[in-house]
A protein has these predicted regions:
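An N-terminal, well-structured beta->alpha segment
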Residues: 1-41
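Glycine-rich phosphate-binding loops that contact phosphosugars or nucleotide phosphates
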Residues: 33, 42-111
Length: 111
């Protein structure tokens, strides 16, 4: 059992190490630093289905590290929850296809 857990943790650590640090990744990190740390905005994550679960996990993980973050359900955003968005907030929208209707609509509705 201990060996299985150890192997799982090693696989997870390797997966993190395998994340490519590209120009786009560096730009995303700089944008987060600028909008959240310098301009005092918050990270607002959103996604539908499994992508929504991932977005929710990202928001809670960021919160636990002291980075203001909240999950916004894209369907609820269309029915009054857009009020959570404020100046300098940064939207992180997650979609497997990039064509999820609710996410596309959220980009149109966002201030």
């Amino acid at each position: 059992m201990i060996d299985s857990i150890k192997q799982l943790l090693q696989q997870e650590a390797q997966a993190v190490l395998n994340i490519p640090v590209t120009d786009a990744y560096e730009k995303a990190v700089k944008l987060i630093v600028e909008q959240i740390h310098q301009k005092k905005g918050k990270l607002v994550t959103s996604g539908m289905g499994k992508a929504g679960q991932i977005a929710m996990n990202i928001a809670t993980t960021f919160c636990s590290t002291g980075i203001p973050s909240v999950f916004l359900h894209p369907s609820e955003a269309q029915h009054g929850d857009l009020g959570i968005l404020q100046k300098n907030d940064l939207l992180l929208l997650i979609s497997n296809s990039g064509k999820t209707r609710e996410i596309v609509e959220l980009t149109r509705l966002s201030p």
